[in-house]
Amino acid sequence: MSRATRAALAGLLGALALGAAAPAGASAEAAAGQAGSAATAGTASAGAPGAVTDLLRQPRVAGEGRLRWFGLQIYDARLFVTPDGVDIERWTRTPFALELRYARKLLGEDIAQASLKEMARMGFGTEAQRAGWLDTMRRLFPDVSAGDRLTGVHLPEGRAVFYRNDTRIGRVEDRQFVEAFFAIWLDPRTVAPDLRRSLLADPAAAARAGASPR
């Protein structure tokens, strides 16, 4: 694999790996088409991991999807919610967990950098805040290999707890950071709208919000 190809792949792997950014030279719209084309509607599946059951009440799968890029499988994503579901219009007030199971190796630095790019693209934070967020993500996110899971648990009051597999790797209490981070997947402005629809596929959850997944 050439250096340019590795750089582009790292951009998209960080792209929605724990952060979303278009590959070098591609527009956000083009990245959405490449990534979202293989996202599939989620259905309830295997039980929630311990990292989720410890923090969420009776967690269940609201939706799941697979991210591919030019035929390469990047990761499988699952969104766990409580019996109350997720309020699509006000998800920042809702407890949930996002689990990503990787299909290939990715550096933690790529995850942090790509996440920051997407937060900035959507207009979250000042330049000074984002510099602090990058430091936080560099401390949080490890390198991952095929089969590894990274899970972010979103809690009320602007808190989040992160796990690698079932080992806790950090906690953040910064409402603006937490909203900006999970917006990468759940905000309507995401570069992978098909994956968002898959994660929010549970019709009962949508009905509770008084809206349907976009």
What are these regions (language model features)?
Residues 4-5, 17, 27:
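Short linear motifs in low-complexity or flexible loops
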Residues 25-214:
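Terminal leader/tail segments of proteins
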Residues 1-11:
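Bacterial N-terminal signal peptides that target proteins for export
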Residues 10-20:
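Bacterial N-terminal signal peptides
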